[in-house]
């Protein structure tokens, strides 16, 4: 009913998404259930413009499940948004290897998004959180380091993983690291 009221009383140019977490789960039931729910809502005469996926995942999340989720979402013909992406390293004191795995997973998610979601249906990727500073996520994933900047606001390997994924190539030769 909420989406029906939003469509009825909202701005006619508003894009309405149905968003959920855990769509990359092992058996894909939640992803398929959400896709079926969107079809159900539309069968009642209410247009749904897109589907959002909150991706609070970890460095050891199953990559095949992530790819399958994006394949299924891409096949809907809807706009697709990754609305909350963060990648846990499962420790508050990550090693260099943990940080490299995190960067690789960030890049993998973006690569799979770009591979399976048609370009005209890619509505964007939002990174959840800024830094690993405890004050920023004391109530969300405490004792971990899920973000692109460390606790002192220095870029982590994950930042480059995102940049490489968005660029579709290794940006090391093109990127000086300067923000100006």
Where are the regions a protein language model picked out?
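Short, surface-exposed loop/turn motifs that are enriched in glycine and acidic residues
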Residues: 26-27, 55-59, 95-99
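Aromatic-rich peripheral "rim/lid" segments of glycoside hydrolase catalytic domains that contact
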Residues: 64-179
